[in-house]
């Protein structure tokens, strides 16, 4: 059997980014053949990725990248908060954000086929799953390239905002922070998605119906509730978070600044997290032990 040297392990690790012990095992199994060991590792890491694929990824990071008038906000997910702070995962997130800005993929599938340092995004992601041991996914991204000015704001790594604007950068930055805090769903009341309005109207109708008041009064109550909701969730109508005596629209007018659009990503938003039942888990383990 060929001797496995430290330099061989280091070379294989450089090629695959796999853990040292995995590299040594692969080299031993391949009897020192680097190419064969690399192939074995690719298969093994791929198997790890396949096993991890069904696991829920509700943690993660939001990364941003701005180069002139091109900007990107991207959300990548992992399984635990611990891994969301992993240096390799954070570096991958930053590279993905920059790649989106430069290559303009149509969607996540198209992005996965692009290359980072000569290796496809998908292969890089798969290798990282093998190295870290958790499922990792690229969930969504937004890309701006309309010629407008851009600012981004990251609250830690869990909330990210990008704002497209004309005018004062400091005012736009304040808007980005406001969006992170108040989470509007649109610029104006007119732009609130119809499905959200319908949902709010349904809730208002149910509440108003319980009042027992005449139909015309109920109708006015419902309309009042809907209009209140529209003001609460539209950016321009919200009280400015740094001075609630004025709306965001009034603040922007005073700063001679126009906001053309924004994107808000909150890590894991809308993803149902797995709730572990510790007692049930222990009971299952005890039952399994008794069967054995």
From Swiss-Prot:
InterPro entries: EF-Ts_dimer_sf (IPR036402), Transl_elong_EFTs/EF1B (IPR001816), Transl_elong_EFTs/EF1B_dimer (IPR014039), Transl_elong_Ts_CS (IPR018101), UBA-like_sf (IPR009060). One of its GO terms (molecular function) is translation elongation factor activity. Keywords: Cytoplasm, Elongation factor, Protein biosynthesis. It is found in: Cytoplasm. CDD domains: UBA_EF-Ts. It comes from the Bacteria. Pfam families: EF_TS. PROSITE patterns: EF_TS_2 (PS01127). Residues 80-83 are annotated as: Involved in Mg(2+) ion dislocation from EF-Tu. Its main location: cytoplasm. Gene3D superfamilies: 1.10.286.20, DNA helicase RuvA subunit, C-terminal domain, Elongation factor Ts, dimerisation domain. One of its GO terms (cellular component) is cytoplasm. PANTHER family: ELONGATION FACTOR TS (PTHR11741), ELONGATION FACTOR TS, MITOCHONDRIAL (PTHR11741:SF0). Associates with the EF-Tu.GDP complex and induces the exchange of GDP to GTP. It remains bound to the aminoacyl-tRNA.EF-Tu.GTP complex up to the GTP hydrolysis stage on the ribosome. Belongs to the EF-Ts family. This is Elongation factor Ts. It comes from Cupriavidus necator (strain ATCC 17699 / DSM 428 / KCTC 22496 / NCIMB 10442 / H16 / Stanier 337). The lineage of its organism: Bacteria, Pseudomonadati, Pseudomonadota, Betaproteobacteria, Burkholderiales.
């Amino acid at each position: 059997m060929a001797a496995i040297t430290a330099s061989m392990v280091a070379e294989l690790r450089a090629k695959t980014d796999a853990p040292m012990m995995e590299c040594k095992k692969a080299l031993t199994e391949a009897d020192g053949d680097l190419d064969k060991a690399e192939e074995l590792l690719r298969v093994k890491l791929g198997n790890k990725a396949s096993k991890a694929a069904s696991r829920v990824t509700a943690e993660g990071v939001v990364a941003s990248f701005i180069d002139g008038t091109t900007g990107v906000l991207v959300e990548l997910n992992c399984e635990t908060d611990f891994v969301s702070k992993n240096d390799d995962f954070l570096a991958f997130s930053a590279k993905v954000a920059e790649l989106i800005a430069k290559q303009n993929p149509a969607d996540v599938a198209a992005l996965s086929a692009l290359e980072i340092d000569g290796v496809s995004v998908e292969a890089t992601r798969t290798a990282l799953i093998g190295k870290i041991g958790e499922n990792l996914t690229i969930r969504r991204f937004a890309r701006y390239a309309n010629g407008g000015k851009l600012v981004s704001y990251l609250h830690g790594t869990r909330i990210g905002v990008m704002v497209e604007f004309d005018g004062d950068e400091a005012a736009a930055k304040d808007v980005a922070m406001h969006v992170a805090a108040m989470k509007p769903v649109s610029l104006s009341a007119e732009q609130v998605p119809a499905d959200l309005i319908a949902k709010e109207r349904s809730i208002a109708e149910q509440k108003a119906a319980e009042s027992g008041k005449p139909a015309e009064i109920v109708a006015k109550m419902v309309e009042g509730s809907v209009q209140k909701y529209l003001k609460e969730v539209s950016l321009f109508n919200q009280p400015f978070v740094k001075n609630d005596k004025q709306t965001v629209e009034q603040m922007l007018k005073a700063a001679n600044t126009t906001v053309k659009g924004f994107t808000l990503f909150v890590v894991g938003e809308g993803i149902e997290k797995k709730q572990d039942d510790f007692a049930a888990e222990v009971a299952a383990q005890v039952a399994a032990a008794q069967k054995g």
